[in-house]
């Protein structure tokens, strides 16, 4: 398995449906108010392409058998751009967990790895997604992308135990003084075993 995962991550050999199927949930339901633009945030261009296009391509290159984009109400322009690609609507903006849960009915019978990523992260690669998915396929229930920040101010902190297992993610505003010094921070992408994902989301208040 270690060799398989190495090949998967380094060479983008991502066709491993025989191992564990992947579905990717792309979160594009944010209002994008800070953009101060009539154009929906996911359709703003980076490198000549909409940000959402980069996320979709990365998900497909990581061998996702399904890619579901979560959209806000009144997102006709994004739906038109997506064409026949799968999507769902988050009727009321109630945060990230609620947005992921919007895809629950479409993944009701799915037993595999759910990759969760944001539409406005165009630099996340298929290699990164495949590595996260492989960690879950290898036996973990959840794998979270983290990175070392020179200045961790404002980022969610990844609190790990002595075995390098994730204990919790703490937002900067909720962190203790000690936790605020943690430089390993949340990269905003995770892989979760299904149907465990939605069992956990059902417990979120």
Question: Which residues are covered by each model-predicted region?
Answer:
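Conserved N-terminal catalytic core of the sugar/cofactor nucleotidyltransferase
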Residues: 15-19, 49-134
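N-terminal nucleotide-binding beta1-loop-alpha1 segment
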Residues: 19-37
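Short beta-strand/turn micro-motifs composed of small residues
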Residues: 28, 71, 118, 146-147
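Short glycine-enriched, charge-decorated loop/helix-capping segments at active-site entrances
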Residues: 39-45, 204-205
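Conserved core of the sugar-phosphate nucleotidyltransferase
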Residues: 76, 124-204
């Amino acid at each position: 398995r270690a060799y398989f995962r190495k090949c998967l991550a380094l060479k983008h050999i991502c066709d491993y449906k025989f191992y564990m199927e992947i579905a990717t949930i792309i979160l594009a339901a944010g209002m994008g108010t800070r953009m101060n633009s009539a154009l929906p945030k996911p359709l703003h261009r980076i490198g000549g392409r909409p940000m959402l296009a980069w996320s979709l391509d990365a998900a497909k290159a990581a061998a996702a058998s399904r890619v579901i984009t979560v959209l806000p109400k009144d997102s006709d322009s994004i739906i038109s751009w997506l064409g026949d690609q799968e999507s769902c609507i988050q009727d009321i903006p109630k945060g990230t967990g609620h947005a992921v849960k919007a895809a629950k009915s479409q993944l009701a019978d799915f037993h595999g790895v759910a990759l969760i990523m944001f539409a406005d992260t165009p630099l996340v690669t298929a290699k990164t997604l495949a590595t996260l998915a492989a960690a879950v396929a290898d036996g973990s229930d959840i794998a979270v992308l983290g990175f070392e920040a020179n200045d961790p101010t404002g980022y969610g902190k990844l609190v790990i135990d002595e075995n390098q297992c994730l204990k919790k993610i703490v937002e900067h505003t909720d962190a203790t003084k000690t936790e605020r010094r943690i430089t390993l921070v949340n990269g905003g992408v995770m892989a979760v075993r299904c149907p465990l994902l939605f069992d956990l989301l059902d417990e979120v208040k």
